[in-house]
UniProtKB/Swiss-Prot annotation:
Part of the neuronal tubulin polyglutamylase complex which contains TPGS1, TPGS2, TTLL1, LRRC49 and NICN1. Interacts with CSTPP1 and LRRC49. Subunit of the tubulin polyglutamylase complex (TPGC). The complex mediates cilia and flagella polyglutamylation which is essential for their biogenesis and motility. It comes from the Eukaryota. Signal peptide: none annotated. This is Tubulin polyglutamylase complex subunit 2. It comes from Homo sapiens. The gene is TPGS2.
Length: 300
């Protein structure tokens, strides 16, 4: 089966690609600095391939996953940015083909003979709560399949939570980070696919759904190319620590505030205060105190 890389301009002339990418091809192509928006076209999977996968793994594939594979046997879309005449690969959106939708096992995670087993790394102290579902297990309680290797930054997984034989309604999508901690993403594959597309495949975007968030470098890219339906709360506090922002209106306002006290200084000659030097001295010290105080809230 042949796979064909589509050049940027082909997205608009191929309706099935436009439908598959939910129209973000045109959004990316119109973004400043974005270049080489490429989709690797894959033929649809045949129904017998899905049936064979289900029989081999003793799992019923969810209906939305089936429909996806009947449209395209996997998905891979990339885009780059041009900075100072250098082209840097940036965005990557991928879903494994059926043949690569393989189960995560001990051998697939570790190859060293004396490495700890996945059972040794189980953390049962953080089980299901009101706001967080029960985490997947590496033993027979869960069946885990890799949807995307995330370019080495983790693994997005289709998780059957009831073991084998596994039913389609028992699936969820989880992110396994490099430290082998689990993070819930979505209840369904369709919901995850929307997240993947709307986050534009930005580096480490899955970490936005973890307690420790995305890295400082990833925040820079998120600020330049904001995801389409991004939760701004994830960026509001921490982004200011890493991205320098210059607001001209605020700069000029602060200058005006410095000028105004100097004009008012001589108008208040009243009692008990030290002459004209009084207003300028305290105001500068208070200004320095406030500025030093405001420079400390950022923490690493």
């Amino acid at each position: 089966m042949e796979e064909e890389a589509s050049s940027p301009g082909l997205g608009c002339s191929k309706p099935h690609l436009e439908k598959l990418t939910l129209g973000i091809t045109r959004i990316l192509e119109s973004s400043p600095g974005v270049t080489e928006v490429t989709i690797i076209e894959k033929p649809p999977a045949e129904r017998h391939m899905i049936s064979s996968w289900e029989q081999k793994n003793n799992c019923v594939m969810p209906e939305d996953v089936k429909n996806f594979y009947l449209m395209t046997n996997g998905f891979h879309m990339t885009w780059s940015v041009k900075l100072d005449e250098h082209i840097i690969p940036l965005g990557s959106m991928a879903i494994n083909s059926i043949s690569k939708l393989t189960q995560l096992t001990q051998s697939s995670m570790y190859s060293l003979p004396n490495a700890p087993t996945l059972a040794d790394l189980e953390d049962d102290t953080h089980e299901a709560s009101d706001d967080q579902p029960e985490k997947p297990h590496f033993d027979s309680r869960s069946v885990i399949f890799e949807l995307d290797s995330c370019n080495g930054s983790g693994k997005v997984c289709l998780v059957y939570k009831s073991g084998k034989p596994a039913l389609a309604e028992d699936t969820e999508i989880w992110f396994l980070d490099r430290a082998l901690y689990w993070h819930f993403l979505t209840d369904t594959f369709t919901a995850y696919y929307r997240l993947l597309i709307t986050h534009l495949g930005l580096p480490q975007w899955q970490y936005a759904f973890t307690s420790y968030g995305i890295s400082p470098q990833a925040k820079q890219w998120f600020s330049m190319y904001k995801p389409i339906t991004y939760n701004t709360n994830l960026l509001t506090e921490e982004t200011d620590s890493f991205v320098n922002k210059l607001d001209p209106s605020k700069v000029f306002k602060s200058k005006n505030k410095i000028v105004i006290p100097k004009k008012k200084g001589p108008v208040q000659p009243a009692g008990g205060q030290k002459g004209p030097s009084g207003p300028s001295g305290p105001s500068t010290s208070s200004t320095s105190k406030s500025s030093s105080g405001s420079g400390n809230p950022t923490r690493k």
